[in-house]
Amino acid sequence: MKFRKGRPKIPRLISEEPQFKLFKPAGTPGIELESEVLTFEELESLRLVDYLNQPHEEAADAMGISRRVFWNILKSARKKVADALINGKMIDIGGGYYKIRECNYEDECQRGRNCRYGVSNCLTLKKDSE
């Protein structure tokens, strides 16, 4: 019989996967740079609070998580971005444990298959391989 510590992890809701998933300092080859991995839910927390100016409570509700969990995700995201900017690291966006919040093609969706509109399996749970 397997026992789990704590509560089960709830997938975070994000609006969409970003179009651009890699940022690096100009003029330096990427192979020479250290990288900082920013998860999709960390990027979503930055988008909601710092870009859209939503209060933490609204942003946490939008992501389907508690304010405390939201704060921890946001704090981690800000630390990673600051480290990358100050120390000249590459920012690699990807991974995490999330679901896409909305899909504009729900009526035409084929559950369990790749979305023909490029939404990347919007109804399928995404999880890190870690």
Swiss-Prot record:
It holds the Pfam family DUF134. It comes from the Archaea. Transmembrane segments: none annotated. InterPro entries: UPF0251. Signal peptide: none annotated. Belongs to the UPF0251 family. This is UPF0251 protein MmarC6_0272. It comes from Methanococcus maripaludis (strain C6 / ATCC BAA-1332).
